[in-house]
Structures are given as structure tokens and as C-alpha cells.
Amino acid sequence: MSISRREFLKANAAVAAATAVGATLPVKIVEAAEQKDNIKWDKAPCRFCGVGCSVLVGTDNGKVVATKGDPESPVNKGLNCIKGYFLSKIMYGKDRLTTPLLRMKDGQYDKEGEFTPISWDSAFDIMADKWKDTLKTKGPTAVGMFGSGQWTVWEGYAASKLHKAGFLTNNIDPNARHCMASAVGGFMRTFGIDEPMGCYDDLEAADQFVLWGANMAEMHPILWARLSDRRLSSPTSRVHVLSTYENRSFDLADNAMVFRPQSDLVILNYVANYIIQNDAVNKDFVNKHTKFALGTTDIGYGLRPDHPLEKKAKNPGNGKSKPISFDEYAKFVSSYTLEYAAEMSGVEPEKLELMAKAYADPNVKMMSLWTMGINQHTRGVWANNMLYNIHLLTGKIATPGNSPFSLTGQPSACGTAREVGTFAHRLPADMVVANPKHREITEKLWQVPAGTIPPKPGFHAVLQSRMLKDGKLNCYWTMCTNNMQAGPNINDEMYPGFRNPENFIVVSDPYPTVTAMAADLILPTAMWVEKEGAYGNAERRTHMWHQQVKAPEGAKSDLWQLMEFSKRFKVSEVWPAELIAKQPELADKTLFDVLYANGVVDKFPSSECKGQYNDEADAFGFYVQKGLFEEYAQFGRGHAHDLADFDTYHETRGLRWPVVDGKETLRRFSKGDPYVKGDKEFDFYGKPDGKAVIFALPFEPAAEEPNEEYDIWLSTGRVLEHWHTGSMTARVPELYRAYPDAQIFMHPEDAKARGLKRGDEVIVASPRGEVKTRVETKGRNKPPRGVAFMPFFDARQLVNKLILDATDPLSKETDFKKCPVKVMKA
């Protein structure tokens, strides 16, 4: 392979730009330097964020030795961010777990005992005993699982089947509850169907971009590289950035806005009002394709019912609405004037107006992008609805460059948590357990008796913690997530439930995380390309990979664990007699037989596996992944969630659903979408009348605000070098050295007022706990006076101890962005 001087110079220029977002060299340059014939390369989606980059995985002598950006990927086009570059090292931490560990004392299980190695059979024996006893004495609502947006598609599907059709409980919820539940709520309320209508191609087609509380430069760096390329190559392109503190995304901002926490609701309504007042409503679009509704207000904060804020709320948890007219909506938002928005938000009026004008201009294609700043919000569903309001009022939606785009945090929060339906209230393809017709469809496809799936939603993530603490949830299995570090209000609501002597806690993880160390039984887990998998990214792209190396001896995939565990239960041991009477032939079968060896999941022979390895197929005697996928895909085909056949995904870099007649769909709800029929330009077919809903929703304050004692807002989040709790990235030496310790970022004047300076050790405290850290007054994050920021990747500084477990009452998603604290010298 040769490179010309011109190509070399061009590549260097590209690298200079890419370095700003932690991107790596284009693959062509990398290959020129490497050329190691003994390395075998295969594709896989990246293990980290929801962008869904494709990487080439290099294996040699049974180990992953290198990764690089995939030049054939339409997502990342050969680029990697810094985390993707070091993917090859995430599986080889020195403390990788390889044997089950049970708390024992004097040779027996003991809640206060020391972790002791045991066999897999022994681990499943004690698990089965605990589950059977709990199911018998307390019933299905006393067992549950906390899963992950990092599960593969079939892991999430197998887990959902095991609980909803096996253990007869809806007590399964993913960690996506903490990050994407408000996005789901926004989609379902406005459009009646989940996930973005646009795609990443809109980054190259949009004229202007608005980032609503999204630090894309660090959290979605490859998409930021594409956005940056558009901004720098188009003279008329502009970038507006809103956040509660300055971050690296502000480096590219033409219009930088730092707003007071919670006031984004005011700004959103101001923009809608501006559009109406300046006669910029796309009347033809609005009349044909939208309707208006007034949302219920004063809905509380998702706290325990006896909390004063819940007692005070008039309509706690009420998501109902009533129809209104356009004129009534216009009157509702008319009080959200420029002056009011500027006063409430602290943003300069001219900056707010500049952004509003861009939305209102019919000749400017607009792309809105948001993630945790909007979703992790006590009114996150409302904020999502209000963002869609702006795009619907102007008709700037579902066409190239006009895109309200909800970004995703995890690699399969879309593909697994949302599409598969691993939430406590959901079923596959946007169906819900509360709907009798949806339960009937699911039960028929799963070949289980009518009435198997409970109609009542199970415990959501925050409620699971409360129920564990209260002794109402007693057998609990956590997989592929580290909630004891990532979840809210750890001291008061989470840790007590794990250590409640009534409860038996199981954690499946490759490493001894904070969550694992609080458990009773730890199960060692296979990672990433140590198993065959599929993820679904933020643009509806489903992408598969083959197993490329063996897991360390003793570590088993989540899928194997779920299916093998199901063999320990006979139907007669877990189902009531009246349910068995409907299909008595199932009585002596195991849950494995009923759920996974049902003639559909097990119909594909192991010989169809095309990867070098497939440990699950070897263990169970059939192509497990293909069988689970093809059964699951039946839910969406013909129902606007169409997936291609299994084998096609292994031959591509992913396809965006709906996939009909072998063709993916770039944009939904507009011409080109196979579900938009005839000569229609738009059809919001998730709603029975084909019309999207524009909601009238007000500003409501945060659950807590700073006071005399706790006088500064704290926001938590991520950094470029680490992902979530650092359970993988902190074990990569290069990433750990790049960012070893969390700090609290403060305004220099706030630090000075407290007698602090950069580098000082401090105590950060809220009414719920305290952490010790160091002050940072410079660097990448620059909060305004009265605001501080602290990342949550550092297991030695559990900052989420400080966070109140207040949630959006509609989505049940926690607000991690607004916590009053005090900062004191240590």
C-alpha cells in the first residue's frame, strides 16, 4: 500500500481537526503504518456510546490486539474517538473476574461473609433456591432485574422473556431509564412511536445547529467531527450552543448561551412564541399534520408518596392532556416573551432572538440535538415535547437537514432497551404491558397461555431501589450496569436495599465494580467481541458482529447466564395452576424449554454460524442468536419497525429500520418512508389520525433549588476520556493516565469566595451525603457563578451520593443535573 505526498498532507490536515475531538488517524494512514499480516480483522460496532461507530477489530493469538476506525462505515467513515482507539484494552484489566464469587462464612452463604470462589453450578443452585423460595412465599413481584442499554439485542430479549413470560413479573428495567426514558416519553406523546425520524445524514444537510444541553464535542465526538466539518466547510452554517456551563462544544459556537438550570423550559416556549408572533408558522403543514393539546400541570417530582413535594403536588404523575386550538396554544405561550426568557434564563436577549430567528426563517434548515441535559430533567418529557413543538410549528421536520434529533448515550439503548422493550412497562415494537391487545400479540408469538404477562407495569429503576430498601423486592439480578455508582441518592435509597438482610443480590459483570462489591453473588461475564452481538444506535441502525475471541475461562456471556439459569425452573414450580391449566402440556417442561427451545428460537442449527466462534451455540446446540433475533423481529415486521433478515446484518455495517424489501429508511414520516402511502408528503402514522401533537406545557421549577446552606448548583456528567462509571475505561492505562481523578469544576470567584483555590481538597455536600475531591477553576469546563460540574466516572468519588432521586413523573427518569450543594475546604 502506498500513499502520495498529497494524500499525506491532506491526511495531516484532517488529523489536526480530528484531534480536537479525540479522533484518531483515518484508516488508510493507519494501514500504511501497520501492515501486519498475522492480525485478523473483522467488524464490530464500538462498545461505548450511542453513536454506533463501526470499528475493525484486530485479533492475534486469541486476543484483541488492535482496533481502528472502519472506512466502510457510513457512521464514522474510518474515524475513531479516543475511547474507540483503545477498545482493544478494555477486556484485559488486571482484575478481570473469572469465577463466581459468593459471600460465605464457615462454608455457607452469609450476607456478611467474604467473597469466596464457587462453581457456576453452585452459583445457580443458590440463585434458584432463593428465587423459588421468594416466588413461592412472596410472589412474582418480589423478584426482579436491572438490565442495560449495553445488552445485545438478544440478551435484552431473552431477559425480557424470562421475566415477563417465565417468572410472570414486569420487574425488569434497564439503566436506559436513567438516560433515555424521557426521550421515549417525548416521542410517544408527540408522535405515538419511538425513536428519531431523522438520521446522521442530516448533519451534512442542515444549515444551522442548536445544541440543547448536549456537550457533543466530548460525549458524541464522531458526530461532532461531522458537525464541525459542516460548520467549517459551509460559509452560511452556524452553531448555537445552550448549556448551564461552558464546555468544549462552546469552542465552535457562533451563538453561545449559558442559562440558569431549569430555565430551558422558558427558552423553548419563548422560541415557539417568537415563531407565532412573527408569522413564521408553516400554516399549511400545521393544519394538515398537527393538532394541539394542553398538558396537565403540577405533576410532582417522582419522589416517595410521603415526600412533602409529592404531597404538595395537585396532579402527581399525571400525563393526561386535553385538546385545544391553535389560538389557545398561541395564547398559552404568549406570556413567554423575550424579556421574560432573558430574565429567567440569564441569557442575553440578542442571543435568544438570534436563535429564534433561525428557527423561524423558512429558508434555514435546522437541526436540534440534545441528550442528557434535556432528558435527565424533572420535566424531561415536557422538554422533549417542546422541542418537537418548534419543529412542527415551522414544518422543519423529517426532511434533509430539518431534524429534531434525540441523541443516545449507550450503544444499544435504542436497539435493546427501547426497541426490544426491556422497560418495566414495555414490550417489543413500542407495545406496552398495560394494553390487553399488546399482551395478546406477545403471548401468541411467545407461545404461552393467555394471561401469562401481568397487566401492571413493574418497578422502574428508582422504584426498584426503594422496593429493595423496603423489603418488597427480595431477589434482584443486575446485569451489564454499575448502578451503585451511576444511580441517584446512593446512601439513602440504594445501598440500604443491597444490604437488606431479606434480599439476595446478584451482579453479573466482568469487573469488581462498586455495584458488584455490594452484592451477595458476583457472576463473571464475557465482554464485547467475546460473544456474538447486535446493537441498535441513535439513527435506528441495527449492527451485528461475530464472536472474535474466547472469553477468559470461567467468564460467561449474559445470554448464556440467562438461558442456563432458566433450566433450573420447571413451569410447575413458578406458574399458578390456573395458568398451567390453559396449556397443561407445559407443566413438566423447564422455562428453558418453553422460552428458548420452543421450535422457533431453536430452529436454526449451529452449522449456520459463520463466525470463528460461538460459545452459546456450542453450549445449547443451536444458533441461539439467530433464533432469538428472528422470533423478536416478527414483532416489528409489518408494523413500522421492520428489521431485515438476520444474515443480512452480518454482511453490512448496519441498516436503519424500517427495512422493507431489503431497503433501509433514512427518514420517517415523510415521502420515502415505506409507511407513508400514496402521494402524501408527511404522515405521522404513529397516531391514529396521522397527526403529531403540539403540547402546551409551562415552566415548572426544579425539585430543589440552592438555599443559604446549599448555595451552589451541582451538575454531574461525563468526560471524553471515560465512559459512564469508568468500569472499562479506567482500566485502560492510557485513558486512566489522561484523566485519573474527578474534580469539581467551579467559577474562580465562587472558589475565592469560599477561601479556595485551584487544586485545593474540598468536601462537596448535599443533605444526602458528601464526597471529597479537588477544585478545578480552569480547564475544559467553565461554570458560571453559582454552578459547579463534577463527572461521575471516578469510583473513589461517588458523586451521585449527593443527588436527590427526583424523577420526571411521566418517564421516571432521574434528574442528575440540578442538585444544590455546599463546597467546603477539607
UniProtKB/Swiss-Prot annotation:
**Which reaction equations make up its catalytic activity?**
2 Fe(II)-[cytochrome] + nitrate + 2 H(+) = 2 Fe(III)-[cytochrome] + nitrite + H2O
One GO molecular-function entry: 4 iron, 4 sulfur cluster binding
- Annotated Mo-bis(molybdopterin guanine dinucleotide) binding sites: 83, 150, 175, 179, 212-219, 262-264, 372, 376, 482, 508-509, 531, 558, 716-725, 800, 817
Q: Which residues form the signal peptide?
A: 1-32
Report the EC code(s) recorded for this entry.
1.9.6.1
Residues annotated to bind substrate: F792
Give the similarity note. Answer: Belongs to the prokaryotic molybdopterin-containing oxidoreductase family. NasA/NapA/NarB subfamily.
What PANTHER family does this protein's entry cite? PERIPLASMIC NITRATE REDUCTASE, RESPIRATORY NITRATE REDUCTASE
According to the record's subunit comment, the protein's assembly and interactions are: Component of the periplasmic nitrate reductase NapAB complex composed of NapA and NapB.
What is the protein named?
Periplasmic nitrate reductase
- Native source species: Shewanella halifaxensis (strain HAW-EB4)
